[in-house]
Amino acid sequence: MAENVKRKKKKRAVLIVFMALVLAVLAVVCVYETELNKLDSNDGVDNSFYDSQFKNKKVMVIVPHEDDDLLISGQVLPPMYKNGADVRVVFATNGDKRVSAYTRQSEACNALEKLGIPREKVIFLGYPDGTQLYVGKKAYSFSSGRDHTYAGKGFKDYHFDRFGTHAKYTAENMVDDIESVVLEYRPDYILAIDFDTHTDHRGVSISFEKAMERILKKESGYTPKVLKCFAIHLRGNQSRIFMHLISRAP
């Protein structure tokens, strides 16, 4: 009899401990969800890292293709913008090797708008995708046949919008345009593509560094904080988590 009472007490104690653990886990999950919702809120997060670090600051993202922006900064751009940063996203190429510039540019703007970044904050330099432009060879857009900067219907390339003419496809002109767009907006923080195995990633990474070398020599008082980031693509059967784009960007 006494043994049965002891067993029942032991089972009751185990059950109480188990229920306490379950309640503790649920409490942690609720707190996590609450804080996550704050991060996703359109109002931003008061007194957060983003508020203290980026409020009233200028942030510029410089990438080759119309998906690299999400790969290197998709998690940080929305809270930066929501907490008062002036965000600009600069695409160096039209991503037009396999599809039209319009398709890639529309996708980019639509994706950024879903993250809260308006279309007017997006800049297209209008250079070709997948060429040997960076090593001094003649370059043409695969989809349009053009040999100068351009943008899809309803969009403008930066050089034409700023100077009234299109820029020929040369490595030097890309460096010039990156230098120009940085000096025009003078961002406090720059997130730029890093050097990897992709031809355009390498080319834009080097072009950015050449542009920054010029800027730092000319403008000794301008010293933005620069973060170089890799744009990593998934390989193999990763369809569950891969971005589904019309263009199926490489």
Sequence positions of predicted segments:
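Short, flexible loop segments at boundaries between secondary-structure elements
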Residues: 217-243
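N-terminal Lys/Arg-rich, disordered targeting/topogenic segments
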Residues: 1-13
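Extracytoplasmic/luminal low-complexity segments enriched in Pro/Gly and acidic/polar residues
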Residues: 47, 246-250
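Active-site beta-strand->loop->alpha-helix modules in alpha/beta enzyme cores, enriched
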Residues: 13-20, 26-206, 212-221
